[in-house]
Amino acid sequence: PPGFTPFRIY
């Protein structure tokens, strides 16, 4: 995904 995140963003 564009921009790593430790959370699942929908």
Swiss-Prot record:
Expression sites by tissue: Expressed by the skin glands.
Any one GO CC term of the record: extracellular region
UniProt main location, coarse: secreted
GO biological process, one term: vasodilation
Coiled-coil regions, chain positions: none
Keyword Secreted annotated: yes
Domain of life: Eukaryota
Swiss-Prot/TrEMBL site (Not sulfated) positions: 10
A single GO molecular function term of this UniProt record: toxin activity
Keywords: Amphibian defense peptide, G-protein coupled receptor impairing toxin, Secreted, Toxin, Vasoactive, Vasodilator
Protein name, as recorded: Des-Arg1-[Thr6]-phyllokinin
Organism: Physalaemus signifer
